[in-house]
Amino acid sequence: AAENVAIAARQSEPLLDMKQRTTHEDPNFMETFFRASRLHYIGTWKHRYEAFLEDLPPAPKLPAPRGGPGGERVILHVDMDCFFASVAALGRPELAGLPVAVSWSSAGGGELSSCNYLARATGCRAGMRIARAKEMCPNLIVMPYEFERYSAVAIDVYRLLHELSPHVMGVSVDEAYVDVTGLDGDPVQIAEDIRERIATKTGCAASVGVGPNRLIARLATKKAKPDAAYHVTATSAA
C-alpha cells in the first residue's frame, strides 16, 4: 500500500515523468528539467515568500534586550524536522511508521533529498543514492518532490511565526529566526508553545533552538533535534 502511494504521487506530477527528464528529443526538455529541480523550487519559493511579506505591515523597531542595556536578546531558530519527508507523509496513513525519503527519481541512481528519522536510523542520509539506501533499508519508501505541498505548509508555518513576533527572518522554506525579546515568559516555554502551534496547524514537527543571537540559537537547535526545544544562554555558551 505504501509503495502504491509513492507511485500514485509520482504519476500525478507530470514534471517527474522520466522521459521529460532524460531525453533531449523533447522540445521542452530544459524547461521541464529545471521546473522539476530543487534549485528551481528554492528560487520560486523566495518569490512566494517575498509576496507573502508584502501583505504584512512593516515590522516595528526591535525591543531593547531583556534586562535593559547589556541584557540578552531572545532569538528562536525554528527548523522543521525532515521537512520534505514529513510533508510527504501528511494525509497518507499508509506511510505512518515507515522509513520515508524524498527524491526526484525512484531509480537507483537518484539521490535522496530528505529522509525521516526512521530512515536515518538505518543509515540513510540526504545525498545518498537510492540504490545504496535500499541496500541499507529495503522497505524505504521513496516519495517524489511535491513542491506545492511544501509551499503551502511553509506559508502556514510563517504565518504562525509572524503571529508570534513581527521580527521574523526567513532563511528557507523550512528554517527561520524569530526575535521574541519583547515577549514575556520563559524562553523555552515560548519555544515549546510555537512548536505546539506548528504541529497542530501543519502536522509537522519543528525543533527550536533558543539563544541570545542567531549563531547560538542555531547551535542550540542541534541539541534540540529531533522534535524538541533547547536554550543556550550567553553564559552557558562561553
Model-predicted regions and their roles:
Residues D186-A238:
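Long, highly charged, low-complexity intrinsically disordered interaction regions
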Residues A2-V173, Y177, L183, I194, ...:
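Residues that scaffold, gate, or flank divalent-cation-dependent active/transport sites
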